[in-house]
Amino acid sequence: MANIVWCNIAMFLLVSLFLTDDAVVVLDALDNVPNNIKNQPYRTGYHFQPPKNWMNDPNGPMIYKGIYHLFYQWNQNGAVMDVNKTVWGHATSTDLINWITLSPAIRPSRPSDINGCWSGSVTILPNGKPVILYTGNDRYNRQVQNLVKPKNLTDPYLRHWTKSPENPLVTPSPVNHINSSAFRDPTTAWFGRDGRWRITTGSQEGRRGLAILHTSKDFVIWKQSPKPLHYHDGTGMWECPDFFPVARTDSRGLDTSFSSGPMVKHVLKVSLTDTFNDYYTIGTYDEVRDVYVPDKGFVQDETAPRYDYGKFYASKTFYDSVNQRRILWGWVNESSPEKDNIKKGWAGLQAIPRKVWLDESGKRLVQWPVKEIERLRTTQVKWGNKLLKGGSVMEVHGVTAPQADVEVFFKVSGFDLEKADVIEPGWTDPQLICSQRNASSGLGPFGLMVLASKNMEEYTSVNIRIFRAGENSKEHVVVMCSDQSTSSLEKGNDKTTYGAFLDISPYQPISLRTLIDKSIVESFGGKGKTCITSRVYPKLAIGERTHLFAFNKGSQNVNVLSLSAWSMKSSL
């Protein structure tokens, strides 16, 4: 696989094509990461980042002729967001891990996108031809929807794209009552039984968030449906909507156009600008009425489940037809001040792509890092059945602590579960529970201290706490935390502590997997039932001065059934 990747790089370095603005073209593989950036302590080793400058939303991920493509919102000119100069960055990969960064696929050049080429999606048409629908910020600063097509379908790297002469395809107006300043991020289209394509686009009417629905026979002329696909009052703007089917009985992915039926549910995800978080609901798509109805217990607002309870936004999925899986991408922003981002010359990265599927309960989605990430594993350290006494800390030796993959299984005895503290009636917000300073209860917090300094002046704690649901209750409440409060001695960083309830039985082994990559910590609890991502910037715990610990701050003992920690190579 490495030989294939290096051959691809060599090929791109030899290519240098110059075409017009409208035929938007790759010149070659972009410059290598400058040494003054590459050697920075917070520059990640195996997460995707462009060579420099600002990156945000993932756009139009797909697989075409065996090559994975990732487009993304990118400011070529600096490490801050500039919506009026945003282009579609472009990268390709054979394995979702090692990426070749190409020149932008779409740049502002027409009246319909002259003030920025914003987010959108790829749709694979029945003839196998990929097309992109994206939002352009036009010369009047209206948000309009545009189409681009690949110029050369025989090129698996899709280096040349051409804008449609019909652009813009959809424009807000007094007639259609679409808010011209809140109409963006069209989804991947799905094909209905009536022979029409459908897309939904995020919007806002007052405080009502909605997913506007359009249909088309030819992918050029789009007609607005009388009703939105879905809406909810009081939520504000719905950015980056994503709508896709999931199988009810197994983890295989489904094509976005897969028909509804008794063995299929649908997911609607929206990114709320009010909270800067992604929320999803699970429900039914009524193909006759062209509306989405969330299942009982789901509401498309801040009470809905989240993909990730940390720093994760503007996410986008795609169907990997080769491996029959649905893959999730998400933007992870910085937690450092803007001045620091400018100084280091870059900002933003993408989370490790995750396979996503419906939990057997039908009440949540499960996420797990794509299996390809395991190819970067090298030296392994293993523990077997170690007792983690209350109040103890144990170092994990023999692994490159700043760049690692750690999976641990904890076990708590039934006797000790009976000694868990009773959760307070008002403790309904897990983030507040996790934010309690110097917390120590009967059971927990226990877990990992990652990106830690030798004497633990700095560390990020990824941990579990267990409570009894009531004084006489045999039920338990499990909370998963990612605590950044002690992550750095630097004063100016965002050190928010994140938390979420983890819907598992504590009588069973409790799994916790954490991907550590210098300034990002991605954690997966309960085999992916709950996920939390953090950005941290230690001053002491850098390079060889970084340590990894298992700990138990509770009063009751916890068993480490197994711990596997791998040093991780950097991706190309």
UniProtKB/Swiss-Prot annotation:
Pfam families: Glyco_hydro_32C, Glyco_hydro_32N
Tissue expression: Expressed in flowers, and, to a lower extent, in leaves.
Localization, UniProt: Secreted, Extracellular space, Apoplast; Secreted, Cell wall
Coarse class of the protein's main subcellular location: secreted
Reaction(s) catalysed (UniProt annotation): Hydrolysis of terminal non-reducing beta-D-fructofuranoside residues in beta-D-fructofuranosides
Cross-referenced SUPFAM superfamilies: Arabinanase/levansucrase/invertase, Concanavalin A-like lectins/glucanases
Keywords: Apoplast, Cell wall, Disulfide bond, Glycoprotein, Glycosidase, Hydrolase, Secreted, Signal
Carbohydrate attachment residues: N84, N152, N179, N333, N438
Catalytic machinery residues: D57
Protein family membership: Belongs to the glycosyl hydrolase 32 family.
The protein's name in its UniProt record: Beta-fructofuranosidase, insoluble isoenzyme CWINV5
Organism of derivation: Arabidopsis thaliana (Mouse-ear cress)
Protein encoded by which gene: CWINV5
